[in-house]
A protein has these predicted regions:
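Glycine/proline-enriched, intrinsically flexible loops and inter-domain linkers
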Residues: 1-229, 233
């Protein structure tokens, strides 16, 4: 969400936008704990970043089974709770350190109810000068710019992977559903979007979720438009 707040900058009051975002990566962290937790915080940053806001603070809340239990007590087809807890913490920390984001509050809950599926929740708070955020309607002839890291084959199926049924075959296939994070690239975009001269050129901005180009670009168009025609250009 985004709200207007007064902020005092160099002794002068300015109109700023304050943004909040939270995201859960329960399924990705359950199957690939390092990447799942890393992209949990990465995804949290990505949403307010598309709103042209800079993320200043984060929070992490997780839930898992008792990490002290013996390996033999691990449920069939599951990673040990200790492996999940330690590797997820390393993944979250790695992404946060690379992008330079402080996590001021962490709460790790241990309960048998989280053995079936882990809880991995991240939350952030971001802000931007209201004058630097333009929200206008797209028009014919507008240019759609794809900005960020190169697209790979990782993460395919991630949008539906958390909801579909799994069997033992999934153990050898579902890890590829977890997107590979790219904190240094996201950090570059963060720094770019702190320049108001850049962000004021943007009519509408959207982040890439699991739906990819078709969803991200489609959401940029107004709901009453029947189609969006794209002519690809590589630079």
């Amino acid at each position: 969400c985004s709200i207007h707040v007064p902020a005092v900058v160099n002794g002068k009051e300015q109109d700023w936008l304050l943004m909040f975002k939270n995201e859960t990566h329960n399924h990705p962290t359950e199957i690939e704990p390092f990447g799942g937790a890393a992209t949990c915080i990465g995804g949290c940053i990505r949403d307010p970043l598309s709103g042209r806001a800079y993320v200043h603070q984060a929070m992490r809340v997780t839930g898992g089974g008792d990490p002290r239990k013996e390996l033999a007590e691990t449920l069939s087809g599951k990673l040990p709770q200790r492996k999940l807890a330690q590797t997820a913490a390393a993944g979250y920390s790695s992404y946060g350190n690379q992008i330079g984001l402080a996590t001021g509050h962490i709460a790790e809950l241990y309960h048998e109810g989280y053995v079936a599926k882990r809880l991995e929740c991240g939350a952030v708070v971001a802000a931007a000068p209201a004058d630097n955020v333009v929200r206008e309607r797209p028009a014919p002839g507008d240019v759609v710019i794809l900005l960020g890291g190169r697209t790979g084959r990782d993460g395919i199926g991630g949008a539906t992977g958390s909801s579909k049924s799994h069997d033992m075959k999934s153990l050898s296939t579902m890890a590829s559903e977890v997107q590979k994070g790219n904190a240094p690239e996201e950090r570059k975009i963060q720094r770019l979007f702190r320049d108001g001269a850049v962000t004021r050129l943007i009519k509408r901005c959207n982040d890439f979720g699991a739906g990819g180009v078709s969803v991200a670009v489609g959401e940029l168009a107004d709901g009453d438009r029947k189609s969006t025609r794209l002519n690809s250009s590589h630079h």
